[in-house]
């Protein structure tokens, strides 16, 4: 199997073609229009011969009568074909960009959490926006150039051979040299283009970090640090761009030099008597004008290589993501509503790319309808245990059961439908409050159900104070809300979901004492008859748990009720003493 570095441009284009093929009708129309456009230019040059030999040569003055009409007709044809080709190419490009973005977006949504752990958000955004646009714009631009300029070159050569094959043959001899020059710079263009895609992702990441963390930047005086970081990646992008310009600029004069040498040689050959005898003023003008006219399409074809390589380099980057393995969803078991029994049996788990296990030999039973709390110092593995229940990661050893069946037996959709999650890092969408509470299921719930969930989460009071109540758009990630308000909307979302298994990962960490008391009452009600896994830093919130499990360095070191663990005077008792000073 070839990786992206081994794929040739042709192989990459062959992979891209199925994306383009459904819109080939637009390409065909554009191609015909481009050929007619090139033909009109070539035919315009051919008019020089009758104009000079007949019109101004006074052998046929009628040429001067019909010639202006032909010129006007050709210009009208040129304008129409230019519009049609541009419109069709833009239509195809837009369709290709949309298709590629949909494929990328859909594929990324199916990627495991470990994929996003390794990738920066800025880089992935750059792939969806910049790279997909680059594929279409570069490829379509290259197509326009190849078809139009290629047709021009063919037309000009045919006309030159028609009028003087002796002079034209000289240019044919030099054609392989042009091909070699293009081949030499081709590899350079591709390498630089790949570097530009990666550097653009770094620029996006740097800008995104500043924009998302602008408050921290201001508070901690990080303006200079962020400026230096952005300047560094921006300069790297500039240098890559200069390398591309340098390579492109070198290829241009090479082609122009070859064309100039050919033209000079043709001028010299035209002085031979055997050639001069067959040339008229009109013929020599057409031939030389055609040779000069060839320089523009030849130069464009040289540049098109760099343009096409940019598109293929971006395309390879996108295919690298599309070739990445998605989440394994091989389970066949579908369940409407689980009883809620969860059990860990000898579970060991290591995060991808790391050597040291995050969890070792975990054995844990969470009976249906019971509440188990996980406590421990930061980084001990509490949140990791919770993330394994939803199969955000797959375990190395052991098994995790739900209602007596291994989690891997269930379809991912069916499994995750059994779990409601409220974490300390709440993510809200740039949508209305109501749509955030009923996220992904807005048609399933009534307005009254959404309001009731908000009321149970003690969120209805601040929601009603908003300009449009539940219909208020809260901005990206709930930027218009306080931390506590975001947390309460997340709790309302979990309440509305009504799943049999509930995971509360520091769910009340962002709340003030008064709000915490109010929401804790709602959470206590929510946890009734549900299997609840509560991760808490504030030990006061989990004192009533059916069982408290203490995790340290990925290992369960203690378990029991609140009172039992205090009497044991172990790790839990130490944590309790640190918080309450008792």
From Swiss-Prot:
Pfam families: ABC_membrane, ABC_tran. ATP binds at residues 376-383. It is a multi-pass membrane protein. The keyword DNA-binding does not apply. Belongs to the ABC transporter superfamily. Lipid exporter (TC 3.A.1.106) family. NCBIfam families: MsbA_lipidA, PRK11176.1. This is ATP-dependent lipid A-core flippase.
